[in-house]
Structure formats: structure tokens, C-alpha cells
Amino acid sequence: MQTAYWLMVMMMVWITAPLYEGGKPNDVIRGLVPDDLTPQFILRSLISRRRSDKDVRADQTCIWKTWCPPSLWRRHDRKGKD
């Protein structure tokens, strides 16, 4: 518990240290964010991770909490072998 407390204190000191050197809060926040992280980059990465409709197979669809087919990664032939 003490380690977590001191880690939190040190992180706060590390983040706020530039303020004592005459920096503005905005500069401190900009210093924590990578330069290539822009809204366009975030949007592009979210779109590229989204599965397209053609990737969704019919056997993976669930009928509203009434029936879902078994997942393909489950191995039913291993029952009782553990």
C-alpha cells in the first residue's frame, strides 16, 4: 500500500515539475502525449480495427439472449480429460 502511495506521489511530482519551471499546464499535458497522436490517427486506428460485415459469419450470430451457437475455439472432445 505504501509503495502505491509513493508511486502516485512521484507521478504527481513528475507531471507538475515543469509548472514550477515556468511552464503552462497545457505544455505539461502536451509533453505527456506523443506528437503523432492526432484525432485523425485515432479515428483511422478505430476504423481499421472494426470488423467489416463480410467478416461476421452466420454461425457467430446470437439471437437476442435466447440462443447462441457454441464458440469455435471450444474443444468439446476434451470433456473429463483434465
Swiss-Prot record:
Its protein name is: Consomatin Ro2
- Residues modified to 4-hydroxyproline: 69-70
Q: Where in the cell is it found?
A: Secreted
- Into which family does the record put it? Belongs to the conotoxin C superfamily. Consomatin family.
Quote the record's domain comment. The cysteine framework is C-C.
Function summary: Moderately activates human somatostatin receptors (SSTR) with a preferential activation of SSTR1 and SSTR4. In vivo, does not cause behavioral changes in mice within a few minutes of intracranial injection, but causes a progressive loss of movement thereafter. Four to five hours after injection, mice recover, even with the highest dose tested. Shows antinociception and antihyperalgesia activities in two mouse models of acute pain, most probably by acting outside the central nervous system.
More about this protein: This peptide is an evolutionarily optimized stable analog of somatostatin. In addition, it adopts nearly identical conformations as in the somatostatin drug analog Octreotide. As this drug, it contains a D-Trp at the same position, whose synthesis is a common strategy used for enhancing the metabolic stability of compounds in drug design. Consomatins evolved by gene duplication of a 'Somatostatin and related peptides (SSRP)' gene expressed in the snail neuroendocrine system.
Tissue-wise, where is it found?
Answer: Expressed by the venom duct.
The cellular component terms of Gene Ontology attached to this UniProt record, alphabetical and capped at eight, are: extracellular region
Sites where D-tryptophan occurs are at 64
* Molecular functions per Gene Ontology: toxin activity
Subcellular location, principal: secreted
The secretion signal range is 1-22
Q: Provide this UniProt record's keywords sorted from A to Z.
A: D-amino acid, Disulfide bond, G-protein coupled receptor impairing toxin, Hydroxylation, Secreted, Signal, Toxin
According to its UniProt entry, this protein's organism is Conus rolani (Cone snail)
Which Cys pairs are S-S linked? 62-68
Propeptide positions, renumbered to this chain?
23-57, 72-82
